Regions:
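Polytopic transmembrane helical bundles with strong interfacial aromatic enrichment
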Residues: 1-128
Length: 128
C-alpha cells in the first residue's frame, strides 16, 4: 500500500464533496449555463481521479508493481490539480487563458492510467 497516496485520496475526496456542494448550492445563481457545465466537468474528473488515487494506492497489495503505481498516483494528483483546478477557476473567474492549461492536466491523468497498467503488467501474479 502507498500510505501517503491513500491519505491524499481521503483529503481529495473531502475536497471534491465540498467543492461539488459549493458548486451545486453556492454558485448555482452566480454561474451561467456554460460556467455550471465547466464546474460540473471539473467536479466529475476530481471525483473519478480521487477514486483512482485510492485504487492506485492499494494496487501493490494486489500485486501491481510499486514504482509504476507511485508514478500513477503522482500523475493523478498533479493531473487533478491542473485539470480540475484550472476548470474550477475558469468556471468561477471566467479567465479564458486557464483553458489552455487544462489539457496538460488531462495528459497527466492519461499517463497515470497508463502507469497503472504498467504496474499491473510488471507486478507478480498474486492470487487473493
Amino acid at each position: 500500500m502507498i500510505r501517503w497516496a491513500l491519505i491524499v485520496a481521503a483529503a481529495s475526496g473531502l475536497l471534491a464533496v465540498a467543492l461539488g456542494a459549493f458548486g451545486a448550492h453556492g454558485l448555482e445563481h452566480m454561474l451561467g449555463e456554460r460556467g455550471r457545465a465547466v464546474f460540473d466537468t471539473a467536479s466529475r474528473y476530481h471525483f473519478v481521479h480521487t477514486f483512482a488515487l485510492a485504487v492506485g494506492a492499494m494496487a501493490p497489495i494486489a500485486g501491481a508493481g510499486r514504482k509504476p503505481c507511485v508514478a500513477a498516483c503522482i500523475l493523478w494528483l498533479v493531473g487533478t490539480i491542473v485539470f480540475s483546478g484550472s476548470l474550477y477557476l475558469l468556471a468561477i473567474s471566467g479567465l479564458g487563458w486557464l483553458g489552455a492549461v487544462t489539457p496538460f492536466g488531462g495528459l497527466a491523468l492519461m499517463i497515470g492510467w497508463f502507469m497503472l497498467g504498467v504496474g499491473a503488467w510488471r507486478g507478480p501474479e498474486v492470487t487473493l
